[in-house]
Amino acid sequence: MTRSIRWRIIVLQIVALLVLAFGSGAAFFANSFTTTQIHDQLAPQQIAFPQNAAQGLPKDLSQYAGQQVLTGEQAHAYAEQYIGLHLSEIGQGHPYSYWSAQARAATDPTVAAKDQAIADTLFKGETLRSMLNQAWTFSVIAEIALIAGIAFAVAALIVLGTLIFEVAEMVTGKETVEAVGPATASEPKLAGIQ
């Protein structure tokens, strides 16, 4: 390999190494920032799973018994398996829009008030459920960023290894001299080319 080609390869490896290292750092930062934001936004809300089934904890959430909701995974479980279950029971299988329409259509003020109370509870519950699922969504994005950061770091290490190899080859002087000049009669000719 000629010296000029080796220098080009080394420069490209340095550029690739810098790009991959920056990408890895940015991905790790995105993971850390997102995870911290999720925790810092959920902590002040003081949302916690019930201690046990007697307090309303569904059986499939027993691993979270008594824990405060601080992670995206916990937020998703709380939103879907706890709030979702209770909203389904409160709304008797119907969504907020159904109960809101029932309240507006009711001619009896007592029935209208009862239906509106159900609609209000469903609205608040669905709003909280949506917010908790947003935290979970961002936690998934944070996990993807972590995986990308690791992949970029591994790729950067591979490029660094090849860069070290190229520099070592250059230092030991294993370049070839590029022959310049017309072809000699002993060199093979390509078929059809004179």
Where are these regions (language model features)?
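Long, solvent-exposed extracytoplasmic domains/loops
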Residues: 47-126
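Hydrophobic membrane-insertion alpha-helices, especially the h-region
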Residues: 10-26
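Short, aromatic-rich amphipathic segments at membrane interfaces
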Residues: 113-154
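C-terminal TM-helix exit segments that contain a strictly Trp-centered aromatic cap at the helix terminus
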Residues: 22-30, 160-166
